[in-house]
Amino acid sequence: MKTYHQKPTEVQRDWYVIDASGKVLGRLATQISTLLRGKHKPTFTPSIDGGDFVIVVNAEKIVLTGRKPDQKIYYRHTGYPGGIKATPYKMMLAKHPDRILRLAVKRMLPKNRMGRRLLSKLRIYAGPNHPHAAQQPKPYIPRW
C-alpha cells in the first residue's frame, strides 16, 4: 500500500470558533496549533497547508495557572544595542489580550513560510463577538 500525499487542490478547510474564557493558555494553544496544521485530519501531510481556520473569542478571559500571572514576562528586542524590552503578563493582558494567545500559538508552529501562512488563518478577538458569521464557523470544544 502506498503512502497517501494530499495535494493542495484536495484540501477541505473548515472554520471553527473557540471560546477561550476560563481555558488555560498553553493547553488551548496546543489545540489551536493542531487545528491550524491539520494534524487532526487523517489526510495530514507535513508539507501541505491542510489545516482549518480558527476564530478565538473572549481572549481577555484566558487563564494562567500558579504564580505565572505575577511572574511571566514577555521579551522582545528592537534590534539596537541594549534594546531589549520586557512586558509583564498583566500589562500585556490589559493592553493586548489577543497578542498573548497569538504568541503562544506562533511559538508552537513551524518557524518557516509554512508557519507564517498557518498563523494567518488564526483570528483572535478579545470580546465575545466576531465578524465571521458568513463563514458559518462550527463550535469547537477543546479537550482540556
Swiss-Prot record:
Pfam families reported for this sequence: Ribosomal_L13
Transmembrane segments: none
GO molecular function, one term: mRNA binding
Keywords: Ribonucleoprotein, Ribosomal protein
The organism's place on the tree of life at top rank: Bacteria
One GO cellular component, as annotated: cytosolic large ribosomal subunit
Keyword check for Glycoprotein: no
InterPro entries in UniProt: Ribosomal_uL13, Ribosomal_uL13_bac-type, Ribosomal_uL13_CS, Ribosomal_uL13_sf
Keyword Ribonucleoprotein annotated: yes
Gene Ontology BP term (one): negative regulation of translation
Family: Belongs to the universal ribosomal protein uL13 family.
Subunit structure: Part of the 50S ribosomal subunit.
Role this protein plays: This protein is one of the early assembly proteins of the 50S ribosomal subunit, although it is not seen to bind rRNA by itself. It is important during the early stages of 50S assembly.
Name of the protein described by the UniProt record: Large ribosomal subunit protein uL13
Taxonomic source organism: Chloroflexus aurantiacus (strain ATCC 29366 / DSM 635 / J-10-fl)
